[in-house]
Curated annotation (Swiss-Prot):
The gene is venB. Its EC number is 3.3.2.1. Pathway: Siderophore biosynthesis; vulnibactin biosynthesis. Gene3D superfamilies: ACP-like, Isochorismatase-like. This is Probable isochorismatase. Binds 1 phosphopantetheine covalently. InterPro entries: ACP-like_sf (IPR036736), Isochorismatase (IPR016291), Isochorismatase-like_dom (IPR000868), Isochorismatase-like_hydrls (IPR050272), Isochorismatase-like_sf (IPR036380), PP-bd_ACP (IPR009081). SUPFAM superfamilies: ACP-like, Isochorismatase-like hydrolases. Residues 207-286 form the Carrier domain. Keywords: Hydrolase, Phosphopantetheine, Phosphoprotein. It catalyses: isochorismate + H2O = (2S,3S)-2,3-dihydroxy-2,3-dihydrobenzoate + pyruvate.
């Protein structure tokens, strides 16, 4: 009973990645990044300072950095310590009593940062007994980028649940780890052929970074996300101060839009009151930039 000690193994090579049955691509506007169960307790079953765990930590760091730059929400799951037998239920029959008070935190190299979301996880799937689905529905998100451990247990269960909830799951095949290399490869094969899309890290990064031009609808979505409300609650002609948008949130939004290629300043936006007026400022800045480029 319990989790076995895990021998090191090399991550799958690009040639070993399975062909996907779908042609899905990651849309940064629709995606959420899940960092699944990267707690000291689970990571410590791997051999320290060796593949796959050292490699996937580095890969998840890169994935998270790209996601945050693209404005993709980052969600962590972590199991609690000292679970009551009633809460743990059937998991005890397979894995014992679970975590004690030690080694519960996320590994230091992947520690959650300000703005990241943390959910307590009780079952294999990240959707069970957590607010993950409600969050994604409220934010209008339809894609889940999945990283972490263990591949054939929680990663696969979460992928299957996402698929059956009409959410496109993307498993980053070299940003997950498993009990064995064979388990790892079987997980990727199953996902690619039955329930989701398997991506290499480099593929995922390219898709995350290939952002579409900013639209009025995306501005509305970004403001709603910043305020923790739904997009239809942000009227295009309402004064944004009355909705609750303060200067700090506005500065964060301006920085996000800078990263998407918009040449606007915080001062310019503050001279406008509503979303529709903000959009006019952005369009004017685009026109001026095009005029200067032609000249």
């Amino acid at each position: 009973m319990g989790i076995p000690k895990i021998a090191g193994y090399p991550l799958p090579t690009p040639a070993e990645f399975p062909d996907n049955r779908t042609g899905w691509t990651i849309d940064p506007d629709q995606a959420v990044l899940l960092i699944h169960d990267m707690q000291e307790y689970f990571v410590n079953y791997y051999q320290p300072d060796s593949s796959p765990v050292v490699d996937i930590i580095q890969h998840i760091q890169r994935l998270k950095a790209a996601a945050k730059k693209a404005g993709i929400p980052v969600i962590y799951t972590a199991q609690p310590a000292n679970q009551h037998p009633t809460d743990r239920a059937l998991l005890t029959d397979f894995w014992g009593p679970g975590l004690n008070g030690d080694h519960v935190p996320i590994v230091e190299a992947l520690s959650p940062e300000e703005g990241d979301i943390e959910y307590v996880k009780w079952r294999y799937s990240a959707f069970k007994k957590t607010p993950l689905l409600e969050f994604m529905r409220a934010q209008g998100k339809s894609q889940l980028i999945i990283s972490g451990i263990y591949g054939h247990i929680g990663i696969l269960s979460t992928t299957l649940d996402a698929f059956m909830l009409d959410i496109q799951p993307f498993v980053i095949g070299d940003a997950i780890a498993d009990f064995t290399r064979e388990d790892h490869l079987r997980t990727l094969e199953y996902v690619a052929s039955r329930s989701g899309s398997v991506k290499r890290l480099d593929e995922a990064l390219d898709e995350i970074r290939s952002q579409k031009p900013l639209t009025l609808e995306q501005i509305q979505q970004d403001v709603a996300t910043s305020l923790g409300i739904q997009p239809d609650e942000v009227d295009l002609d309402e004064d944004l101060m009355f909705v609750g948008l303060d200067s700090m949130r506005a500065m964060v939004l301006v920085e996000k839009w800078h990263q998407q290629g918009e040449n606007i300043s915080f001062g310019q936006l503050m001279e406008a009151a509503s979303l529709r007026e903000w959009w006019l400022v952005i369009e004017q800045a685009r026109n001026e930039e095009q005029t200067m480029a032609v000249a």
